Amino acid sequence: MTLAALRHWVFDMDGTLTIAVHDFAAIRRALDIPADDDILHHLAALPAEQAAPKRAWLLEHERELAYAARPAPGALELVHALRERGCRLGVLTRNAHELALVTLQALGLADCFVPEDILGRDEAPPKPHPGGLLTLAERWGVEPGALVMVGDYRFDLECARAAGAQGVLVNLPDNPWLELTEWHARDCAALLAQLG
């Protein structure tokens, strides 16, 4: 099966649809999280009274980034082309749902996605857990293998693999994770060109 034949596309947000601007090392320092710890998993493991102010800080920090979001090369054209072809489109992000909506609005893509098909860290387990993709597959009435997960990091590809979906790596010059996917495009414009 070719990617062009697939009709159900799910996108990561930051670094995939947007130009990546998160400084995760600085976020870890600000929240006193060890350098090697996953931010969301670390916060989830904290007692509620310790996690609450850190989550609030993270949400406000990410809000500033969401309002200033800029599209990754070719992202607008890719999403619009897929919508024009009648594809179902979703977002699966480790960001908050409300900020995903702000980001899509800032990019001019808000009308391309049904809000219920935008899953953030509170609507689905954070990637690489496959729960978000499985939720969208069920909602859309398709097998997970009918989904394409487009992302810029191994968590996106691991999520796709665990769900049984197709994973596509974008916005990197090379594919450092060949064991997770053969589908790779240097950016979203190149991915659109591959679709023909």
Task: Name each model-derived stretch.
Residues 24-25, 72, 76, 96-98, ...:
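Alpha-helix N-cap/helix-start and coil->helix boundary motif
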Residues 1-8, 97, 103-196:
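Asp-based, Mg2+/Mn2+-dependent phosphohydrolase catalytic module
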